[in-house]
């Protein structure tokens, strides 16, 4: 499988030293949306939920034949992600980054082979962002304790 950025929830028991945001890998893109001083100007993000990658890799090992599968989730703008985070966590509104307006948003990936060969359909970007943000907020609280 050749996915784009991985986002979503952290692995159970995943520990990160306080403030070590580099350990978040590509989830840092989502974490950075939690800081008002950040100006987000990346128009779109191609992503896949980390859980879908894991499922795809396991199913791929069990599928006969050799396949090269490109797989990714629906694309979204980081401005949409900021707005969505504000809607599910209204207490964060004053804390969130600002995003440049953009209309550029189009997934260039065709997931039909993943659906056919692996019976795999990507999760929505909202589910991945919600689960990722929730875990990142829990992690952040553990840094303060």
Predicted features along the sequence, with ranges:
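Short, flexible loop/turn elements at secondary-structure junctions
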Residues: 5-7, 75
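Glycine/proline-rich active-site loop of Rossmann-fold NAD(P)-dependent oxidoreductases
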Residues: 9-26, 59-68
